[in-house]
């Protein structure tokens, strides 16, 4: 926990709707990293938040963007899920934004010259589509909790400046 302006722990009594947004929110790949065995049970961030909040708090979800591609579906328009993420934020009391990398983007067995094929990273920034999603969530005016899932260093300066918890 790098930052908490008092928003955490979540107060289930005061929250009516939570938005869970981001490509790693419901991703099992993001949980395991690139060196892993087989767990007997996985619990994604989205599943864990839903379990914690129970039936009294409404949970809205959106993938928001792909991990690094400019669209989530091959034939879709660019930023095809960004509008959906904005609507989730607009209709939520708080947004939990789950960004980062997974085993497909970081590791040692990939193409070392290709940062999008588990190769060496050329920057500490998240992929541009995730930076765009972060900016859209900051512009929503809603409290945002950033949950970073990555096995390497990531520049979080934007998140520290614009979000309520990191």
What are these regions (language model features)?
Residues 1-166:
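C-terminal non-catalytic regions of proteins with extracellular/luminal or membrane-system context
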């Amino acid at each position: 926990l790098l930052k908490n302006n008092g928003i955490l722990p979540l107060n289930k009594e005061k929250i009516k709707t939570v938005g869970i947004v981001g490509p790693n929110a419901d991703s099992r790949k993001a949980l395991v990293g690139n060196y892993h065995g087989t767990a007997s049970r996985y619990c994604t961030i989205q599943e864990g938040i839903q379990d914690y909040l129970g039936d009294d708090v409404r949970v809205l979800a959106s993938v928001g963007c792909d991990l690094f591609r400019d669209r989530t579906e091959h034939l879709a328009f660019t930023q095809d899920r960004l509008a959906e993420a904005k609507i989730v934020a607009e209709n939520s009391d708080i947004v939990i934004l789950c960004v980062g990398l997974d085993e497909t983007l970081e590791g040692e067995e990939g193409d070392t010259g290709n940062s999008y094929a588990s190769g060496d990273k050329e920057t500490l920034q998240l992929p541009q589509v995730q930076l765009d999603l972060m900016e859209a969530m900051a512009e929503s005016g809603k409290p945002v909790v950033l949950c970073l899932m990555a096995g390497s260093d990531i520049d979080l300066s934007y998140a520290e400046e614009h979000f309520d918890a990191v």
